[in-house]
Amino acid sequence: QKGFIGGEFKLGIIPTVMPTLLPMFLKTFIKRYPKIKLKIEELNTEEIIQRIKDGHLDAAIAATPLKNEHIKERVLFYEPFVGYIPNNHRLTSKKTLEISDLDINDMLLLEDGHCFRDGVLNLCKANKTSDQNEFQLESGSFEMLVKLTNEGMGMTLLPYLHTLDLKEKEQEQLHYFSEPSPAREVSLIYHKSELKIQIIDALHNIISGIIRGAIAFQNVQIISPIAT
């Protein structure tokens, strides 16, 4: 019976997923499973993999595929990358973006250590040119990337869920990619030994059910979150 699932459960979440996804499911989960003592920690992917292997984390929400033999992955959703472009930009007039439009030299990036940054770099690899004179900036938050884009310092790419929190005026600066849209795969990951699988199942079911109403994108191409 659902009501009898209980005990401590340690969940890791990567920083680029935590602020948008956690508020969507946390209240529902706690209400439905009051006996589970959920401990949540924001961790990068490397830390998550290590802690799952060491048994210090029961599960995590991360960008996949990670191709790690110790870890099982269950897809929660596919989250498209969305262009956020200032008004004075060469791509401002484009209704939909192509991957070939991207230029790493005018792209504002998250700082090193974020798998979303590695995904963007993998996306830009195809047409990579390097020009040392260009202004380059890396930041720890999407909020800062949005502010700098608003100042005309370049363009950036945002995960779709993050775009839902933008102000109405800022929404006008979003440019979607033509299908199949580049996207990241976000999964619930856990050790292959499947300890606490009942709680993992419960978590997967609740998040999948909630996210279905927010993200309906199916025609996507998955961009690897691993630095190449």
Walk through the language-model features, giving the residues of each.
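Short beta-strand-to-loop elements that line the ligand-binding cleft
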Residues: K37-N44, A63-T64, S130-S141
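Secondary-structure junction motif
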Residues: D106-K128, K196-Q198, H204, I211-V220
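Short helix-loop hinge/linker segments at domain boundaries
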Residues: Q1-K10, I30-R32, L66-R74, S93-T96
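Beta-alpha-beta core module
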Residues: N68-V75, E79-P80, K94, G140-S193, ...
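Short beta-strand-centered segments that line the small-molecule binding cleft or hinge
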Residues: M24-T28, T45-F81, I85, N122, ...
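Short, well-ordered beta-strand segments
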Residues: E8-G12, A60, Y84, L108, ...
